[in-house]
Amino acid sequence: MKIFGEDGFRDLFKKGLLEEKFLNKFFSALDIFLKRQKVKKVFIGYDTRFSSKYLIHLIIKNLISIKLIYVGNKPLSTPCLYYSSKQRKSFSIMITASHFQKNFNGFKFFYRGRKLDKNYEKKILSLFKYVNKNKYKIKQIVKKVSLHENYLRFINERFNFNNINKKILVDFANGSTSVFKNKLNFLKNCNKINYLYNGHNINEKCGSNFLKKNINKKNFKKFNYCIAFDGDGDRALFSKQKYGIIESEKIAIIFLNYFKYHKGHSVYNVVSTKIVNPWLKEYLKNENNIRLYKTKVGDRNIINKQIKVKSILGFETSGHYSFYYAMDGIYAAGLFLEILKENPELIDKIINIPIAYKLKIFNFSSNCTKDIKRKLKLIKNKGNKIIVRKSIWEDTTRIYLFYKNSQIK
């Protein structure tokens, strides 16, 4: 059974990978791993799902070798916990299913300021056979603490402005970024929606999952720009009035141009995934002399490549943007609004650039992939590009068709 994806694991609450029996075994194995690594304290963050309380209790029950466990006193965004983990050089567990609906949950893991790497994941899985052999539990201290302060200070010092001469709508997806509603300086004068979380409304017809549909609603149309987060705040989508959702490739170009030509940073490359629009590589090379590196889909893959090639920016087409080697939707929102305030012409210029390839995404049951792929190869021979990717968490294979022929349906 596959457990880890590229960013922890998730499942339906109390089903599959989130069944109590499996989780007891997993966190007991994690406990052995942490003991061998001489980890003495663990930090736990969580988003706004109703199931978080149950999972916190289960984790604490099984980490019998950890002396100090700190639990956030309120929901926490994943970027916030990552920043806290990096500052404290600790082991941290984020309880979240990101953009998935309320009946899902899952876990992301951070160790020494980085996402848990594959070698550590393999070590944890290899320890399953030792579970239940050591029942000794040390005297444990569990504290509820605030884990927000350092991150909020970092963000507010970086984006120290609040007066933007545009009408901005921010959708918090009833997720963990909701707790920052009145604490982020750069959002002070923005209109805000979907922040009254109740444990059962995270990502419910709101946030980044539904921005494409919601921007057609009357209450969205009156704003110049909309920003939508997902449930744990590591992604952000942007839309402009009368344009629609701004493609992540164009957002990346906006960021890169701002860094290079307005902030004077050295920008030689950028990292994205294999499903990025093929147009981007040629555009960056010809217009900005910037090299595009591609890697497998997944936050960890992007960040590892970003570190390796020393890139100022990494991004996924889903709306994840990495600046300080972490995917951070809040930072992305702050940067976008900073550019909107200081150089709105740059945004207008970039979003009006024509994209050579259009994109269609086809979802199929995984057992149909071979037949579909064979048919799509006929289209590829006409100068189009095809990428086939199997979903980690669903029995679905996605086929990405990048095409120039407007006749394709």
Q: What is each model feature region?
A:
Residues V39-D47, V71, K167-V170, H265-S272, ...:
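Short glycine-rich phosphate-binding loop at a beta-alpha junction
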Residues Y70-T78, I245-S248, T295-K296:
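Active-site nucleophile and cofactor-binding loops and adjacent substrate-binding regions
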Residues I3, L12, N105-K221:
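Gly/Ser/Thr-enriched, mixed-charge loops and adjacent short helices
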Residues M1-I66, I141-K166:
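An N-terminal, well-structured beta->alpha segment
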Residues F223, K263-K409:
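Phosphate-binding and adjacent anionic-ligand microenvironments
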Residues I32, K41-F104, L184-S239:
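N-terminal small/polar loop signature for handling phosphorylated ligands or for N-terminal nucleophile
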